[in-house]
Amino acid sequence: MRPFSLEVSLHLPWAMAAHLLPVCTLFLNLLSMTQGSRDPVVPNQPFTTIWNANTEWCMKKHGVDVDISIFDVVTNPGQTFRGPNMTIFYSSQLGTYPYYTSAGEPVFGGLPQNASLNAHLARTFQDILAAMPEPRFSGLAVIDWEAWRPRWAFNWDTKDIYRQRSRALVQKQHPDWLAPRVEAAAQDQFEGAAEEWMAGTLKLGQALRPQGLWGFYNFPECYNYDFKSPNYTGRCPLNICAQNDQLGWLWGQSRALYPSIYLPAALEGTKKTQMFVQHRVAEAFRVAAGAGDPKLPVLPYMQLFYDMTNHFLPAEELEHSLGESAAQGAAGVVLWVSWLSTSTKESCQAIKEYVDTTLGPSILNVTSGARLCSQVLCSGHGRCARRPSYPKARLILNSTSFSIKPTPGGGPLTLQGALSLEDRLRMAVEFECRCYRGWRGTRCEQWGMW
């Protein structure tokens, strides 16, 4: 089903666009009855790496060609941040997102319950059409809103201002109420408005570009940052899981989940990365299943560096992040690189060398391992996911069976070799199949929408 021709309204004034919102809502109701997610993200590719980096600047500004085309990576034409395969919306690029500045000044009302959702959706209507001119857009559509979190309990530290101002708003409306009643009302108002804003934005995006994989960056969160604990396991705290369970409306409205597996600098050299990543990815699968859609694509966001540093991830850490995501059955990963990392010729050259020598071969290894496992175990109609009893298993190719070599004269890397009987048996023991939509059976060999 295609949406009505909204693209002709690209330059509608806000007021006129607002009149179309009821039509969008009606369309969304019809859309929800035919909901489906394409599995895999790229045809015949059970695990996909998406490049969300503005490395076009390396070529345009510094003459450094970061060539990722030879590594089986999906990117936008020209390696732009936003395009037909991958579009990310930051808070200033989508609608009228309410928040407080670092100085405590409100922008667009500051609080979601104190802002105009209609004005936001009218502006969002135009922003989506401008960023995604093709009605059949079928790439990743990621919304990055980080000022506040939709659960009251999650707004701590600098985000506590949203709880403080919510209480003040209720107290102003009801000066005779006691603190417990104010607290309860403030929480209800904030969480209710946060749901309306986030779910409403997703619904509008899906109405306008129904084939896009819409979702919010860094949801779900796991908050497993207690690295200094001598008994660190990486597990998400139980109270965090309980809070995530209250966000069923968000998981149910999303068309993909984008948890963050950015590696904090404190993890460097600790040997705890695998535990950290394992449970962050697992939490995404858990909430998807809890929302009734275990086949919802999970695409973790990762970086080339330890977070907030210029230290590239060594090959071992790529195995613990990229490889761990693939082993759990993720549809892929999104590789994000900040603008700052492409600001100088030296930084661009460093990225190019890292991609050529470390990242590229790792991507090819994991992508090929996932594809071969899909073909061997799942008839090519599903992706392999690690069995719970083998928490260390990876879809990493056996170095005695395969080698990765450059093509003479430049060009794509070449994977040489074949799965041995031992490799196949290991896959069968350590992994099981998660069938794509429409397929079933132990080996995903049976077609039918049952």
Curated annotation (Swiss-Prot):
<keyword id="KW-1015">Disulfide bond</keyword>
<dbReference type="GO" id="GO:0036117">
    <property type="term" value="C:hyaluranon cable"/>
</dbReference>
<feature type="active site" description="Proton donor">
    <location>
        <position position="146"/>
    </location>
</feature>
<dbReference type="GO" id="GO:0030214">
    <property type="term" value="P:hyaluronan catabolic process"/>
</dbReference>
<keyword id="KW-0326">Glycosidase</keyword>
<dbReference type="InterPro" id="IPR018155">
    <property type="entry name" value="Hyaluronidase"/>
</dbReference>
<keyword id="KW-0458">Lysosome</keyword>
<keyword id="KW-0378">Hydrolase</keyword>
<dbReference type="GO" id="GO:0005975">
    <property type="term" value="P:carbohydrate metabolic process"/>
</dbReference>
<dbReference type="GO" id="GO:0005764">
    <property type="term" value="C:lysosome"/>
</dbReference>
<dbReference type="GO" id="GO:0071493">
    <property type="term" value="P:cellular response to UV-B"/>
</dbReference>
<dbReference type="GO" id="GO:0006954">
    <property type="term" value="P:inflammatory response"/>
</dbReference>
<feature type="glycosylation site" description="N-linked (GlcNAc...) asparagine">
    <location>
        <position position="398"/>
    </location>
</feature>
<dbReference type="GO" id="GO:0051216">
    <property type="term" value="P:cartilage development"/>
</dbReference>
<comment type="function">
    <text>May have a role in promoting tumor progression. May block the TGFB1-enhanced cell growth.</text>
</comment>
<feature type="disulfide bond">
    <location>
        <begin position="373"/>
        <end position="384"/>
    </location>
</feature>
<dbReference type="GO" id="GO:0036120">
    <property type="term" value="P:cellular response to platelet-derived growth factor stimulus"/>
</dbReference>
<dbReference type="InterPro" id="IPR013785">
    <property type="entry name" value="Aldolase_TIM"/>
</dbReference>
<keyword id="KW-0732">Signal</keyword>
<feature type="signal peptide">
    <location>
        <begin position="1"/>
        <end position="35"/>
    </location>
</feature>
<dbReference type="GO" id="GO:1900106">
    <property type="term" value="P:positive regulation of hyaluranon cable assembly"/>
</dbReference>
<feature type="disulfide bond">
    <location>
        <begin position="58"/>
        <end position="348"/>
    </location>
</feature>
<dbReference type="GO" id="GO:0009615">
    <property type="term" value="P:response to virus"/>
</dbReference>
<feature type="domain" description="EGF-like">
    <location>
        <begin position="433"/>
        <end position="444"/>
    </location>
</feature>
<dbReference type="GO" id="GO:0030212">
    <property type="term" value="P:hyaluronan metabolic process"/>
</dbReference>
<feature type="disulfide bond">
    <location>
        <begin position="435"/>
        <end position="444"/>
    </location>
</feature>
<feature type="disulfide bond">
    <location>
        <begin position="378"/>
        <end position="433"/>
    </location>
</feature>
<dbReference type="GO" id="GO:0030307">
    <property type="term" value="P:positive regulation of cell growth"/>
</dbReference>
<dbReference type="GO" id="GO:0046677">
    <property type="term" value="P:response to antibiotic"/>
</dbReference>
<feature type="glycosylation site" description="N-linked (GlcNAc...) asparagine">
    <location>
        <position position="85"/>
    </location>
</feature>
<protein>
    <recommendedName>
        <fullName>Hyaluronidase-1</fullName>
        <ecNumber>3.2.1.35</ecNumber>
    </recommendedName>
</protein>
<comment type="similarity">
    <text>Belongs to the glycosyl hydrolase 56 family.</text>
</comment>
<dbReference type="Pfam" id="PF01630">
    <property type="entry name" value="Glyco_hydro_56"/>
</dbReference>
<dbReference type="GO" id="GO:0004415">
    <property type="term" value="F:hyalurononglucosaminidase activity"/>
</dbReference>
<dbReference type="GO" id="GO:0071467">
    <property type="term" value="P:cellular response to pH"/>
</dbReference>
<keyword id="KW-0325">Glycoprotein</keyword>
<feature type="glycosylation site" description="N-linked (GlcNAc...) asparagine">
    <location>
        <position position="365"/>
    </location>
</feature>
<dbReference type="GO" id="GO:0045785">
    <property type="term" value="P:positive regulation of cell adhesion"/>
</dbReference>
<dbReference type="GO" id="GO:0045766">
    <property type="term" value="P:positive regulation of angiogenesis"/>
</dbReference>
<dbReference type="InterPro" id="IPR017853">
    <property type="entry name" value="Glycoside_hydrolase_SF"/>
</dbReference>
<dbReference type="GO" id="GO:0071347">
    <property type="term" value="P:cellular response to interleukin-1"/>
</dbReference>
<feature type="disulfide bond">
    <location>
        <begin position="222"/>
        <end position="236"/>
    </location>
</feature>
